[in-house]
Amino acid sequence: MIHWAKYYHVDGFRFDLMGHHPAEEMKRAKEALSQLTLDKDGVDGSRLYIYGEGWNFGEVANNALFTQATQGQLDGTGIGAFNDRLRDAVHGGGPFDDDHRVLQGFGSGAFSDLNGLDTRSEADRRADYLHRVDLVKLGLAGNLKDYTLTTYDGKTVSGAQLDYNGQGAGFASQP
């Protein structure tokens, strides 16, 4: 990463499956990059960005082998995590769906331009759509775990309390 930043002026690094890396490894990489200076290296390392897919799954799930670089475990590091909550709310579908076209998202016609594949009742589709609107609202607020919003059904919840596939939707302490 140092080589790419110094010699090719790459200013951001995205990690696929970042959750399969130890959080300490990612923090060391961030620290090493931050040591680069304009005078010495031709790049301001403090301005370089690291982010990735902070998914919690597979053989390392739930910190089985090490503390993972996952959503909610990178607070205060300056390392970002991809927002799958916002993606799924807008695009539709989810990571465990057999056919991602069935559950339409906020931006793909859910409740306004139905594709005919979703066989749920209108009430269930409406509730899902409105929940996706709540996920979009939270995403626009930086997916902050402490952000408070009023959900479609009138409840006041924090981002951490808003459901996303059985876990809290809000995972960030800063946007």
Task: Write out the residue ranges for each language-model feature.
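Conserved alpha/beta catalytic core and glycan-binding cleft of carbohydrate-active enzymes
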Residues: 30-32, 45-175
